[in-house]
C-alpha cells in the first residue's frame, strides 16, 4: 500500500521542484523512488531516515532541518524546525496523516509538536498533499492540525467510494 501511494506521489513531481517530505513512512518510500530514478530536484525534510538514504551521490539536493529530536517520530519537530520552515516556499509537500475525519473536516496526528510542524509545512507550500492509506479516513489522532480545505489533494492506494469522493470534491481535494 505504501509503495503504491509513493509511486502516485512521485508522479506529481517535476524536475527542479523544491519539495518537503515530512516524517512519514510513506514519504520514506517517496524518497526511495526519487533516489532510484535520480530525479533532479531539492528535497527538504525533517526525517532522519530520508537524510540517511541520501548519503550516496545523487542528483537530488537534500536540505535537512533540525530542531527538537522526537525519538518516537524519528525526526525533528518543534519551534526551531518551524522557524526554519518559514524561510522556504515549497513547490509541493507530502504530509503524512494519522486521521482524516470527513464528518468534522479535520486532519490529525498523534503529537502536538508534530502537528504544529505539519501546519507550518502546509503554510509554506504552493501545493500540499495528504499521503495516507484509505484506512486513515474517518480515523482520529490526538491533535488536529488542519482541515481538508488546507490541502490540494489526497493520495491513497485505491479508488474511494462515491460518497467519500463527493465529500473530498466539495472541499476541492484532488484525488490521486
Regions found by a protein language model. Give the residues of each.
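N-terminal active-site beta-alpha-beta segment that forms phosphate/nucleotide-binding
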Residues: 1-88
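Conserved phosphate- and dinucleotide-binding cores of soluble alpha/beta proteins
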Residues: 51-176
Amino acid at each position: 500500500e505504501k509503495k503504491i501511494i509513493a509511486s502516485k506521489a512521485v508522479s506529481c513531481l517535476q524536475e527542479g521542484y523544491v519539495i518537503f517530505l515530512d516524517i512519514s513512512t510513506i514519504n520514506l518510500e517517496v524518497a526511495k523512488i526519487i533516489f532510484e530514478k535520480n530525479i533532479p530536484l531539492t528535497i527538504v525534510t525533517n526525517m532522519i531516515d530520508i537524510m540517511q538514504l541520501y548519503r550516496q551521490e545523487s542528483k537530488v539536493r537534500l536540505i535537512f532541518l533540525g530542531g527538537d529530536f522526537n525519538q518516537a517520530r524519528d525526526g525533528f519537530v518543534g519551534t526551531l524546525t518551524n522557524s526554519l520552515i518559514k524561510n522556504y516556499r515549497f513547490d509541493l509537500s507530502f504530509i503524512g496523516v494519522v486521521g482524516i475525519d470527513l464528518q468534522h473536516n479535520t486532519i490529525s496526528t498523534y503529537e502536538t509538536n508534530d502537528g504544529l510542524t505539519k501546519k507550518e509545512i502546509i503554510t509554506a507550500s504552493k501545493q500540499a498533499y495528504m499521503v495516507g492509506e484509505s484506512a486513515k479516513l474517518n480515523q482520529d489522532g490526538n491533535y488536529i492540525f488542519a482541515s481538508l480545505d488546507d490541502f490540494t489533494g489526497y493520495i491513497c492506494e485505491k479508488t474511494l467510494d462515491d460518497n467519500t469522493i463527493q465529500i473530498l470534491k466539495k472541499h476541492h481535494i484532488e484525488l490521486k
